[in-house]
Regions:
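A detector of low-complexity, intrinsically disordered, Ser/Thr/Gly/Pro/Ala-rich segments
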Residues: 6, 22, 63, 300-302
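Positively charged n-region of N-terminal signal peptides that target proteins for export
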Residues: 1-4
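Active-site-adjacent loops and short helices of periplasmic peptidoglycan-processing enzymes
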Residues: 18-168, 172-181
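Bacterial N-terminal signal peptides
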Residues: 6-16
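Penicillin-recognizing serine hydrolase domain
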Residues: 26-33, 105-106, 130-307
């Protein structure tokens, strides 16, 4: 009798243990093709989804642009002139800012981050002591120094598909950016009215991350990005169950998909439930992942053949 009771208890404990392990091992279902999440105060990742795959990161690039600016020691109150670009702008680089007008560097940084203003990011690079090329070189040097070993930048705006990184590398970048109050404050400004001079005029800008406007999220760092090749992207630090969490989401279909993924991660951390993704977004992620895996396999075959 005692042996029978003992076996019953053992079986019950094993079942509970297996159920608990299964719930903790499950990861959230996401619309994003690549993703990672990490607690701000701890090393390592809470989870990763193709987190080491280098892909175009679009305007997430501007987080590194901001890091170079604030760590350069330049006068943040200096008036910068928006001069005509020395390189041809991409087709989607249209800006409301008038060529020849001026704005203080801290406000140029603000609209580059919160509203992803490309002319602003370009101007920050052009007015760097080493000029545009020196700025891009410093972006890459800083990435290397931080240990972002699969990251490469070719411009400060993110309009080039040559700007590539991984979800894991961008967690590192978020940690570095989070140390600077100027970046935190500028990236999470909800709305801002910039006052230009020469000529004097003003423009209103809004944050491209809808979650910034929700107090319940406690967003302390934010940057969105989009290119056709990169999909919808988001890097964010927000409160999740009382803990500041870095969320990196790369390449999803819809405008709101990254915000939806952030919500799924938040619920997963609270409940262990993986959640569900809309069929169209799920299909996009599966097709994109299959294409990337095929490209990776082809590259591996080419590399192997060339080394023989």
């Amino acid at each position: 009798m005692r042996y029978s009771v003992f076996l019953t208890v053992v079986v019950f404990l094993l079942a509970v243990s297996c159920q608990s392990a299964a719930s903790t091992e499950r990861v959230p279902n996401l619309a994003s093709v690549q993703a990672a999440a990490a607690e701000v105060g701890k090393e390592g990742l809470l989870f990763g989804k193709h987190a080491d795959r280098p892909v175009p990161v679009a305007s997430i690039t501007k987080l590194m642009t901001a890091l170079v600016v604030v760590e350069s020691g330049q006068d943040m109150d200096e008036w910068l002139t928006f001069e005509k670009r020395h390189v041809e702008a991409a087709a989607n680089a249209w800006s409301r800012i008038r060529v020849g007008s001026q704005l203080r560097r801290r406000d140029v940084l603000r609209i580059a981050l919160m509203s992803s203003e490309n002319f602003a990011a370009y101007t920050l690079a052009r007015t760097y002591p080493g000029g545009f090329d020196g700025f891009v070189a410093e972006m890459n040097a800083k990435a290397k120094a931080l240990g972002m070993l699969q990251t490469r930048f070719v411009d400060p705006t993110g309009l080039s598909t040559g700007n590539v990184s991984t979800a894991a590398d961008l967690v590192i970048l978020a940690r570095a950016a989070l140390k600077h109050p100027e970046i935190r404050e500028a990236s999470t400004t909800g709305y801002y009215r910039a006052e230009f001079r020469k000529p004097r005029y003003s423009l209103s800008f809004g944050n491209t991350n809808a979650l910034v406007h929700r107090d319940s999220w406690g967003v302390s760092l934010s940057k969105t990005g989009y290119l056709t090749e990169a999909g919808r992207c988001l890097v964010m630090v927000s409160e999740m169950n009382g803990t500041p969490v870095i969320t990196v989401l790369l390449d999803s279909l819809g405008t709101r998909s990254p915000m939806g993924d952030a919500g799924r991660i938040k619920r997963w951390l609270a409940t262990g439930q993986p959640g569900s993704v809309a069929p169209a977004a799920k299909r996009y992620a599966q097709e994109k992942n299959s294409a990337l895996m095929a490209a990776e396999a082809e590259q591996s075959r080419t590399t192997t053949a060339s080394s023989q």
